[in-house]
């Protein structure tokens, strides 16, 4: 299925890097928002998102800007091209806006734009067990867990506002059930990473790279065991093999 139950997906992004930045100045989202507002009022275009994060590297004059965003409407070559063009236009515009209106950016230069669009969400597998937001936020542990997640839900639904962040129970982590990786209707078809069967809130936590590694490992082990056994493996066998391979379950 495409996106969530309403057919919505999270915004895609393309970071860019600036050099020559005085990182002793305020690099907060609030400072970015102030600069973007001034740029918009001055008539600058291709600035849809009001703010974003500037990631600094201590002791350097380099920042990575996480601002340009676009809402995917499919994965055709035409649509991917449209998004790439739009995001690169945004990156150039945001770099110019920050240079002109944000203190500390007066001598900044655009040195790099990400090599390709970052897609947070597209199609998902319809699985046998749905991971829920409550499972994630409460740090639920379960006997059928085959991977762990610890990233808090990070929801990028708006093209104009910054992401919404929800806190996982402090000091905790949550299990991802084997059924969230298994197709509801097709034998020995598994999905991992952004394919995991999860509701909107849970998906915003499991789509990140570290958790994708864990679910990919689990899906591969489960599918291989099923191919060897000729039948669906029990979760205990999958967990045991993952632990044998030093997986954290």
Task: Label every PLM stretch briefly.
Residues 1-249:
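Flavin (FAD/FMN)-binding glycine-rich loop and adjacent Rossmann-like elements that form
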